[in-house]
Amino acid sequence: MSANLKYLSLGILVFQTTSLVLTMRYSRTLKEEGPRYLSSTAVVVAEFLKIMACIFLVYKDSKCSVRALNRVLHDEILNKPMETLKLAIPSGIYTLQNNLLYVALSNLDAATYQVTYQLKILTTALFSVSMLGKKLGVYQWLSLVILMAGVAFVQWPSDSQELNSKDLSTGSQFVGLMAVLTACFSSGFAGVYFEKILKETKQSVWIRNIQLGFFGSIFGLMGVYVYDGELVSKNGFFQGYNQLTWIVVALQALGGLVIAAVIKYADNILKGFATSLSIILSTIISYFWLQDFVPTSVFFLGAILVIAATFLYGYDPKPAGNPTKA
């Protein structure tokens, strides 16, 4: 049963991530009158939707009893403040990570950023080994290195994108490099820390998602105030929202639920593979649908490497002859 849930959750993650990327691209390219929707507010609304969905799922698990739901929420969240506070750590780190990536993008050329940021694949594996005691074989480590290279090639910027930042100073590039490296380590730690909480405590995935969403909403509202406070006060929180925007928000909320399920029933490393495959899938669909991407030989090389790495990670060599104990 758990194996079925693992592959089902990974499949849904690929579908959700691909759909989200495509709808986000499409929604941001539409030319409409009035202001565009603010991505910072969309993140907050998605967190609230995720919380509401999780409360409904807890309600369903409580045999559709409002009294039982209130008891579960009271016992598992209000009566366990320290357990709830544990989720402030990954939520805060994710917020910090988003800010670090903004600094990195402002101080690095696109190619350096894309290649360096793929180190998060290896940092996730390192934290999985050190914090969860996960054992990886030689083929699995090799597949992670190949995956890192493949994703970097798939997302390699075109010549027109590279022309933007040729005159960056050495000091500026150092700041950008430190920012992206810190983001890589924080991403790996936060993901594995959340996995450790999900797998080593008795609270359900939905309760943990409510706790994570609570802190995510707080940090998200802080982000709205800092980055878009002036625009919100001028045009409103829901400026630019339309039917497509709500689809994007709903997909983001679904992503939070699916990622938690993937981490619970699979792990962060497999999540990385699923996300990498969705990058390729969304890019190919984008070429045919949105026509905003022209595949290059570098992209095809990266796609081959990602697919090869995926198969290599699952490769389990049969011991020949008399097996020896490690």
From Swiss-Prot:
Domain of life: Eukaryota
Entry GO MF terms: antiporter activity; UDP-galactose transmembrane transporter activity
Annotated phenotype, changing residue 42 to G: Severe impairment of UDP-GlcNAc transport activity
GO biological process, one term: UDP-N-acetylglucosamine transmembrane transport
Record-given protein name: UDP-N-acetylglucosamine transporter
Modification comment: O-Glcnacylation regulates the stability of SLC35A3 and the specific complex formation with MGAT4B.
PANTHER family (UniProt xref): NUCLEOTIDE-SUGAR TRANSMEMBRANE TRANSPORTER
Impact after mutating residue 47 to A: Abolishes protein expression
Topological type in the membrane: Multi-pass membrane protein
Key words, A-Z: Antiport, Golgi apparatus, Membrane, Sugar transport, Transmembrane, Transmembrane helix, Transport
Family that this chain belongs to: Belongs to the nucleotide-sugar transporter family. SLC35A subfamily.
Range of residues in the leader sequence: none
CC terms in the record's Gene Ontology section: Golgi membrane
Reported impact of residue 50 to R: Severe impairment of UDP-GlcNAc transport activity
Transmembrane segments: 4-24, 38-58, 136-156, 174-194, 212-232, 243-263, 269-289, 293-313
